Amino acid sequence: MNDTEFHQLVDAQMQIIEESIDDSGADIDYEVSGNVMTLEFEDRSQIIINRQEPMHEIWLASKSGGFHFKLVEDKWTCSKTGMELFEMVKQECEKHAGEEIDWA
């Protein structure tokens, strides 16, 4: 994939994350600045999601540590855990929020 395709795919993934947070009704603030999305929780803890263009990866940093995601068979997959990005975002949001979130 070239850089343009990478950015289009990451933009689509970030949009899914934003819409899911909005639809969940959870008390999560998010801000996108350049290549970085910051999710902030009531206790002021944060999850940082950013795109790494040179490696065509998405990186996620949270209380649980740092994770790198590569596009594998049309899914952003963690090189450490094998978990899909959106599943990791949901799991980490619930850890940071300290409660289950309705992602319906």
From Swiss-Prot:
One of its GO terms (cellular component) is cytosol. The keyword Metal-binding applies. Keywords: Iron, Metal-binding. GO terms for molecular function: ferric iron binding; ferrous iron binding. The keyword Iron applies. Belongs to the frataxin family. Involved in iron-sulfur (Fe-S) cluster assembly. May act as a regulator of Fe-S biogenesis. HAMAP family: CyaY (MF_00142). This is Iron-sulfur cluster assembly protein CyaY. It comes from Vibrio parahaemolyticus serotype O3:K6 (strain RIMD 2210633). The lineage of its organism: Bacteria, Pseudomonadati, Pseudomonadota, Gammaproteobacteria, Vibrionales.
